[in-house]
Amino acid sequence: MDLRIKDKVYLVTGGGSGIGGGISAALAREGAIPVILGRSPLQKGFRAEVLALQPLMHFIQTELTDGQACADAVQEAVSMYGRIDGLINCAGGNDSVSLETGVEAFRVSLERNLVHYYTMAHYCIGELKKSKGSILNVSSKTALTGQGGTSGYTAAKGAILSLTREWAASYLKDGIRVNAVVPAEVWTPLYERWVNTFPRPAEKLETIVRNIPLGHRMTTVEELADMAVFLLSPLSSHTTGQWVVVDGGYTHLDRTLTAR
């Protein structure tokens, strides 16, 4: 299927690994140009993979909690390509900042998981108006269910869902579409490392997947990335303000369905 995004330019925060890396690769596979923003250098293997798919890809090493750095990154992309067709806000991480951790840690968590979503959209919006582009925000099922012991992260992810609808409403007349994907249990290298911290990793993984109704398995990065790229593409041209949960029924389906 041709998603009709060839040669379009997409900024992907946190696009060098995990879910963001999957989205960058999926964009490149469709002929789009991913401009990857991240704090750490790209791993050589990943860079080579994306370059093989899209030689025009670009990486900007930047600190997303620095507003001026975000503005500079957007300007660098515009200077290189002359346009921005979409923004994928993905960077962040579950930092276990609980109600008892403290106010300053909570503020830092919001900076790392929420504020740069706004900052990047703020600096991209002028170019997105020109291109009638799209914004894709990556949230989390914790925004809908809670998790326990992670107030900062869940507050950020809930706010991301609210901003998705607010921005969709704000820019209807400009033809800018804004949607969110809501993952639950996605098998990324980071998730694998977390599972391996348990004394019996295989048993821990089994306790997780038995509660995922569809197939009793983890969501793959590719499955989530495919949905994200579809929502960015013209094939979803009448879809905006939506929260698309990609989780094998984990969040919403009756738990009795998980019985094997």
Task: List the predicted regions and their residue ranges.
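Catalytic Tyr-x(3-8)-Lys segment
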Residues: P201-E223
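Short C-terminal tail/terminal secondary-structure segment
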Residues: T145, V229, T240-R260
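Conserved mid-core segment of classical short-chain dehydrogenase/reductases
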Residues: G93-V108, G149-G152, E192, T256-R260
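Residue(s) in the substrate-gating loop at a strand-loop-helix junction
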Residues: S140
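Short, small/polar-rich loop/turn modules that mediate ligand/substrate recognition or access, typified
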Residues: L172, R177, T239-G241
